[in-house]
Amino acid sequence: MKKWFVCLLGLVALTVQAADSRPAFSRIVMFGDSLSDTGKMYSKMRGYLPSSPPYYEGRFSNGPVWLEQLTNEFPGLTIANEAEGGPTAVAYNKISWNPKYQVINNLDYEVTQFLQKDSFKPDDLVILWVGANDYLAYGWNTEQDAKRVRDAISDAANRMVLNGAKEILLFNLPDLGQNPSARSQKVVEAASHVSAYHNQLLLNLARQLAPTGMVKLFEIDKQFAEMLRDPQNFGLSDTENACYGGSYVWKPFASRSASTDSQLSAFNPQERLAIAGNPLLAQAVASPMAARSASTLNCEGKMFWDQVHPTTVVHAALSEPAATFIESQYEFLAH
């Protein structure tokens, strides 16, 4: 973390702006997980996950997610989105041979994928929103684990700066203990604690880097907390139960059949085993298979679409304050 701090401080002299000016942006470059995925995982998994319908056009929700709804506030906004379902902040595949870490992405590799085909432009606003999968999907939920996640985020941001990124916006995490998945796993207390600790670490990081003028923090947890505290103000009546109780995929499968399952014929043997052993698909074994008819479910008043992901109504409610914050800190210039 020290090298990242020194690197950015070294760039302060090169980042001269008037005190009352807002840096301009015309494109958002997004790095994150399923909360921001607009179809990358669906494409990567050859239309297998998440099954659509019931999932909306490859999104992990029943409608558009917050990121794409930003275009309502910023007409003409260009988005380069590397976020996909399942990624962790930490590259666990580098420290473990467990197959479940070999197919799911991580933040550092998302950056690599972006740099292989694109580059950071002077008018890019880079957003990082990641970490929930480390804690909730994979169970790395101690304070030491949170420090490792923080370091992965800071290292990735440092790499972005070294590759030309000028403006970086960090998103913190909602209270993961309020997620239906945390309740079903009986990890409410641990999930709440680690997400709060994560947010404090991220706040401290943002404060340390404030002198650079390049890194800001959006505390999206406050919007989630407001929805839980006063759900009626957002048209919500149920903040605990998922609208949809099925799986991510139409046809459940288990590790023992992964090598022969015809549904996985498009993947090589290593990919099949990694997919079958991954927590992202764990509910595909134990839960009812995805149902196309579920796309017609009435989710009015529901905060959560499934055990992990919010409904599109909640995404809209998150998009509005995100847009307000972005507008207050940056100047949008449509191309």
Curated annotation (Swiss-Prot):
PROSITE patterns linked: LIPASE_GDSL_SER
Keyword Signal set for record: yes
Enzyme Commission (EC) number: 2.3.1.43
Keyword field: Acyltransferase, Cholesterol metabolism, Lipid metabolism, Signal, Steroid metabolism, Sterol metabolism, Transferase
InterPro entries in alphabetical order: GDSL (IPR001087), Lipase_GDSL_AS (IPR008265), SGNH_hydro_sf (IPR036514)
Active site: 34 (nucleophile), 306, 309
GO MF annotations, alphabetized: lipase activity; phosphatidylcholine-sterol O-acyltransferase activity
Pfam families listed in its UniProt record: Lipase_GDSL
Residues annotated as signal peptide: 1-18
Gene Ontology terms: biological process: cholesterol metabolic process
Keyword check for Lipid metabolism: yes
Record field: catalytic activity: a sterol + a 1,2-diacyl-sn-glycero-3-phosphocholine = a sterol ester + a 1-acyl-sn-glycero-3-phosphocholine
Protein's job: Fatty acid transfer between phosphatidylcholine and cholesterol.
Similarity comment text for this entry: Belongs to the 'GDSL' lipolytic enzyme family.
UniProt protein name: Phosphatidylcholine-sterol acyltransferase
